[in-house]
Regions:
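Conserved redox-active cysteine motifs that mediate thiol-disulfide chemistry
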Residues: 75, 83-100
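Bacterial N-terminal signal peptides
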Residues: 10-20
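Thiol-/selenol-based redox modules, centered on thioredoxin-like
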Residues: 164-197
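A short beta-strand-turn-helix
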Residues: 49-79
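N-proximal helix/coil linker or "cap" segments that precede and/or mark the start of modular domains
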Residues: 21-61
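Short, internal strand/loop/helix patches
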Residues: 118, 130-165
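Hydrophobic beta-strand anchors of alpha/beta hydrolase catalytic cores
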Residues: 80-81, 117
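Bacterial N-terminal signal peptides that target proteins for export
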Residues: 2-11
Length: 197
């Protein structure tokens, strides 16, 4: 009988401790909970990206120097920002879609200077991002976010998440998941670009 009472007391104590830890954790996350997930009409928060990986990436983004930069320094009217995870199978499927979108944009003289693409690897370290870029033949700049700082500023969106943003930071479109119809998606991007002019 004593063992039974001791066991009940032990479990009751564990419940109280866990509840207390959960309450402290919830209080600590109060500020993080206030960050809304990015949505159409919102303004993209400022965040810093690593220096471009090469002078060709620097030139593509229209940056003056090979130094860390903010999205607001990118020389474009529209920025396509892809948030992905290096271990995400859906993100891997989205890779070829984005490569095709990039090619469509670069092949269109009316769009190639006005629309730029970048990717941010939520939780991804530079080495894994480099491997991703090589394996999937990604032609546009990718940036690591090993501490998920950028991802958290964006409100922890599910991945893959494609944002279409104006150069002033207004979010015009948000797409979650793999894009099923690449041609239609490109037409939408082109229309968004033309509507911004």
């Amino acid at each position: 009988m004593n063992n039974k009472k001791l066991t009940v007391c032990f479990f009751a104590l564990m419940v109280i401790i866990c509840w207390g830890l959960n309450s402290v954790s919830a209080l600590g996350d109060e500020k993080a909970d206030k960050v809304e997930t990015v949505a159409v009409g919102m303004t993209l928060p400022q965040f810093q990206l690593n220096a471009p990986g090469s002078s060709s990436e620097q030139k593509y983004l229209g940056l003056k120097d090979l130094e860390p930069f903010s999205w607001s320094q990118i020389s474009a009217e529209i920025i396509i920002l892809e948030i992905f995870g290096v271990y995400c199978p859906h993100c891997r499927k989205q890779g070829p879609v984005l490569n095709k979108i990039y090619k469509f944009i670069q092949d269109d003289p009316a769009l190639k200077d006005g629309i730029k693409m970048i990717g941010v690897a939520a939780g991804g370290e530079q080495k894994k991002v480099d491997r991703w870029k090589t394996t999937l033949h990604v032609p546009f700049p990718l940036h690591p976010d090993p501490e998920t700082t950028i991802w958290q500023k964006l409100g922890k969106p599910g991945v893959p998440c494609t944002l279409i943003v104006t150069n002033s930071g207004k979010i015009i479109a948000v797409h979650y998941g793999v894009t099923e119809d690449t041609d239609d998606f490109f037409r939408q991007i082109k229309k968004i670009y033309e509507d911004q002019k």
